[in-house]
């Protein structure tokens, strides 16, 4: 799915117009301080373009966290983002304490030319996601008439709509699909993300390698299935490798992750790989632990030896890393989704770190390397490799759904050209 037939910001006339822009400011926070401003920085080019081209105002809307439709300003307010934003484009930012309603509509109706306005968290209203929780924690559904009113109020805040929230593009939420304005364009971040993935999936450089990690096979079945039609090689690592190894090699895996649901489809996936001529690399050795704990006792195991009862594999070992590095060395394009060990804990981070070093090395020799958001993007931040690979996606779930071959509702809703 690409943006080739969708309106993009560079083709949108913003002069004298109020631009209402959906951004992804869902940033990690600690004690009301922003710990990683990557997503805020990523939105600046679109904001700056509007201001440089004479937009009357830019009204920014975003969610933060999962307040589930209940206002929680102490925990999930976007106010700290307003402070951070001021320092980036060096412009004053007006922060409003709500995102819809008469007062917000009034503030956005005729602002001073060149204003930047940030609305409060969209998810303080249950109408944004269409569902949430009440004060007692029970699930509630939004009233359809109120959803319509919420969307109508958002639509009054601008003359044209820009969506630059790639990280939320897989969600059919009100701010993503319900703003009713004549022109709806994709912002620069949305464009960059979709162009990278479109090229990677529609006309890849070959050999094309997918590195797939993470825990559950069942969660990644669609991903593996779709990628087996596109790639030349695939590394299957992380926790889900144990389900493959138990089914295929009858390996003893101790208390390592085993995905009962996913195990039923392992043989089908392997025969599809064989039919498509895709070379699959699985780990051959492991760093083990006597419990799921940062300070667990550490051991070693191989596929042949098996993992003893009561122990679990939490990282791949040096022989696996060698096999992975050979696959990386053969590739001209790599898409990586999911770490190959519990990288958050030093004792089990070596496999993912060694693989990251190889991917960086491949990038420097001209290989196209795409990191698919989520945990793998966190690895890049941790080891400072964000600018040493071709592209780090800002959207975990959205990039996963693109790699699964799905249509993203937030992109689908943009104006056609």
UniProtKB/Swiss-Prot annotation:
Chain positions recorded as ATP binding sites: 215, 220, 239, 313, 344, 375-376
GO molecular function, one term: ADP binding
Pfam family, one: PGK
Subunit structure: Monomer. Interacts with kinase MAPK1/ERK2; the interaction is direct, occurs under hypoxic conditions, and promotes its interaction with PIN1. Interacts with peptidyl-prolyl cis-trans isomerase PIN1; the interaction is direct, occurs under hypoxic conditions, and targets the protein to the mitochondrion by promoting interactions with the TOM complex. Interacts with mitochondrial circRNA mcPGK1 (via its 2nd stem-loop); the interaction is direct and targets the protein to the mitochondrion by promoting interactions with the TOM complex.
Organism: Sus scrofa
E.C. number(s) listed in UniProt: 2.7.11.1, 2.7.2.3
Residues binding ADP, per UniProt: 214, 238, 343
The protein's name: Phosphoglycerate kinase 1
UniProt binding sites for Mg(2+): 215, 218-219, 375
Homology family: Belongs to the phosphoglycerate kinase family.
Signal peptide: none
Positions where Phosphoserine occurs in the chain: 2, 4, 203
Keywords: Acetylation, ATP-binding, Cytoplasm, Glycolysis, Hydroxylation, Kinase, Magnesium, Metal-binding, Mitochondrion, Nucleotide-binding, Phosphoprotein, Transferase
Residue sites binding (2R)-3-phosphoglycerate per the record: 23-26, 38-39, 62-63, 65-66, 122-123, 170-171
Gene3D superfamilies recorded: Phosphoglycerate kinase, N-terminal domain (3.40.50.1260)
Function: Catalyzes one of the two ATP producing reactions in the glycolytic pathway via the reversible conversion of 1,3-diphosphoglycerate to 3-phosphoglycerate. Both L- and D- forms of purine and pyrimidine nucleotides can be used as substrates, but the activity is much lower on pyrimidines. In addition to its role as a glycolytic enzyme, it seems that PGK-1 acts as a polymerase alpha cofactor protein (primer recognition protein).
Binding site for CDP: 214, 219, 238, 338, 340, 343
N6-acetyllysine modifications at: 11, 48, 75, 86, 91, 97, 131, 146, 199, 267, 291, 361
PTM remark: Phosphorylated at Ser-203 by MAPK1/ERK2 under hypoxic conditions, which promotes its mitochondrial targeting.
